[in-house]
Amino acid sequence: IPERKLTHEELVRAIRLNIAAEHEAIFLYMAHAEATDHPLVKEVLIDIANEERVHIGEFERLLEILTGDEDRYVAEGREEVDEMAEEMTAAEQAEAPEMGGEEITIGSLKD
């Protein structure tokens, strides 16, 4: 049992760390899912990764409540990206590389 409770600032910092950990878990689970051909394992790993995404939403909502201004900064960032996207011409958007093209793999993990 800890000797003291977290201060408000420490709690906010801890929640930010929790969000980072959830992102790391998603990366790890998705990497494992992409590295296997086993359908059940792939499905379970993707499901778990999606659960981590829900956790991120829960932690982000807590940050909004605790900080009182987190949503303002998130909204500002979204607006900046939307403005950049609007400024791109159709030709520029067409030239952008497509995601999910030819897959590069590490080869067999058995060999």
Feature locations, PLM:
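Iron-associated oxidoreductase/ferritin-like identity signal
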Residues: 1-111
